[in-house]
Amino acid sequence: MAESRSNRAAVQATNDDASASKLSCVKKGYMKDDYVHLFVKRPVRRSPIINRGYFSRWAAFRKLMSQFLLSGTSSKKQILSLGAGFDTTYFQLLDEGNGPNLYVELDFKEVTSKKAAVIQNSSQLRDKLGANASISIDEGQVLSDHYKLLPVDLRDIPKLRDVISFADMDLSLPTFIIAECVLIYLDPDSSRAIVNWSSKTFSTAVFFLYEQIHPDDAFGHQMIRNLESRGCALLSIDASPTLLAKERLFLDNGWQRAVAWDMLKVYGSFVDTQEKRRIERLELFDEFEEWHMMQEHYCVTYAVNDAMGIFGDFGFTREGGGERMSSSASSP
């Protein structure tokens, strides 16, 4: 019955909303992204609260990713983006001189075909992939030395394994796994299976999760209704409705340690103070009550497997404080 509240095409369309929101932020000066405009057909101007909310999400993601890329002594690292949509992070990292050894993006074929077409038709993107790159719009894939875009249904774990193998991911390398508003649209069993598979597959890894929480209060009820009216049911939210439940999702499925903060705390205590001062001057902002409620209903969770011992200083607090550890990881 839950599936009837979720429409695959509608969930994929949230990707267009995300790109439009990102472009709105870029145009207002919240952040730099020279490529997102290539994926937006009809630019829209978002409200200040949406712009600030999207900025806080982006800032937390980029700060944690930067920590990952700077961890340890080896420069050989890889990034795996689950449900990548039209994200342009790889191209931004190249411009910053921080491109990983391999960046793999996975999504439904309907999405990867559209993204492959944009890359094919844009020299701004295509030229960054190198002379050996091959692009197939029909197959929905892009293959290059350091970047791969591939189609897969994430719920199909055997196919997910095959795609990772096809992408030539090195399972021994430190890996940053991204899932932004992805797992929560899947049924709970599929979400757990992906978290469990990723833990078993990558022994030195960080999993970055961004999604909704607290469906049971008035704001949460309205959030759920709004999404369901668009065919975008959050099928997994009742299985992990709180910060503690988000942490348990990872700890119960093989990850060594995990921490979840709501976005109000992330913005207040983790996003760079100078950056906050800068963006808070960009637009008139008076929606403080709604801002607090909205930010309390989204969270960042990160989980860590640290076989190489390089992530001791990784995280919100940078000294490992406040993290929950699995019983096996905390045993002597």
Curated annotation (Swiss-Prot):
Phenotype on disruption: Reduced rosette size and early flowering. Reduced length of the main root and reduced number of lateral roots.
Coiled coil residues, start to end: none
GO MF annotation, one: S-adenosylmethionine-dependent methyltransferase activity
Catalytic activity: [phosphatase 2A protein]-C-terminal L-leucine + S-adenosyl-L-methionine = [phosphatase 2A protein]-C-terminal L-leucine methyl ester + S-adenosyl-L-homocysteine
Upregulation: Induced by brassinosteroids.
Locations listed in the record: Cytoplasm; Membrane
GO cellular component entries: cytoplasm; membrane
Signal peptide feature range: none
Main location: cytoplasm
Positions annotated to bind S-adenosyl-L-methionine: 22, 57, 83, 107, 153-154, 180
Keywords assigned by UniProt, alphabetized: Cytoplasm, Membrane, Methyltransferase, S-adenosyl-L-methionine, Stress response, Transferase
A Pfam family hit: LCM
Annotated protein name in UniProt: Leucine carboxyl methyltransferase 1 homolog
Organism whose genome encodes this protein: Arabidopsis thaliana (Mouse-ear cress)
Taxonomic lineage: Eukaryota, Viridiplantae, Streptophyta, Embryophyta, Tracheophyta
